[in-house]
Every structure is written in C-alpha cells, then in structure tokens.
Amino acid sequence: MNVTPTSAIIKEFAWAAEAIAEMQAATNLERYEKAWLDYLHYLDRGWNKLEKHLAGISQKNLSQARQTRKSDALLSYLMHARNVDEHTIRQVVVKRPGSLKITGGPGGGTIQRGVFSGDGQVSNIVYEGALDIEFVPERMEIMGVTDRGVFYDLPKSHLNVPLNSLIPHELARLALDHYNSSLNAC
C-alpha cells in the first residue's frame, strides 16, 4: 500500500475524530479522560505531519500555519496541554461535580416542598410563582496548564471567535475542523 503525505495526515485526524466520538459516548469520566488524552496525541501527530507536508509545498503557508498555531488561544492551549500530558505527571482536565440550579422567574418563586435527587430528577415539588430548575451533570473541563515553566490559561477564543465552553469534546471539534480545513486548502 502506498502511503501519501496527505493520507498519513488524514489517518491521524481520523483517529482524533474517533477520540472525539469516544468522549461523546463515554459512560464514565475515566473513559472520557482517556479519549481526551488520545485526542491530544492524535491531533499533535496530525499537526506534525501537516507541518512537514506544508514545508514541501509552500514556505508562506507553513509560516502562516505555524503563526496561527502559536497565536490562536485554543490551538496554542491544545499544543501545550499535550506537552504537559506527555512530559509531566500533571493533569490537563479537571472533574467538575454536578449541580442543581434553581432560579425564580419574574416575581420570584417559593418552594414549599420537593425532592431533588443527585441525578437531576425533581419529584413531588410544590411551589408558588415561577421557577427555573437546571441540572448540570458531572463533567470534565479543561484547566490551565504549565508547560516548561509558562502558564497557559484557559482559551477564551478560537480564530477571534469567543469560546463559551470548557468541555473538551466541544473544543476538540473546533480545533480538528480548523486543521482539516488547513489540510484541504493544500
């Protein structure tokens, strides 16, 4: 079988996409974290191969791709998170507990009684007024990382678009889409 430079890149990015699917299908946070770490690995390997491919095509495109990877908050963060996972014993994600948020609507509300379980189920609730009840399940979120003595905070944007999530698989999809479009532009 003849392996082309682009087929090697496509393979790594396909494995990164599989890791995203594994995160989304994970039945526990340990499996989710493993899929996240796999994703970081495959994304970085795909980038390394893309970088070598670009070097053989256009120095201008290579320079732009490297600059974007260094200056974009999300892409830079992912690079350093992978480095931290690969070369240290520090964590790159944090487990957040589930929570239940109850807010009163216009005019407020009063709960007289009810049962709120840890899985977000609400039963036998008696209340007056307007209430909004929101359950946020236990989840993994990215965390700031220190790579080679430099702290990299949580990314706030990707390609100048604000990020409104710290959920790994949501951020992973954005970065993978960017790298795939870079490959398609070759």
Predicted regions, residues:
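Acidic, Ser/Thr/Gly/Pro-rich intrinsically disordered interaction regions
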Residues: 1-37, 58-186
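Core of folded catalytic or high-affinity ligand/protein-binding domains
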Residues: 38-45, 49
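Short, Lys/Arg-rich flexible segments
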Residues: 53
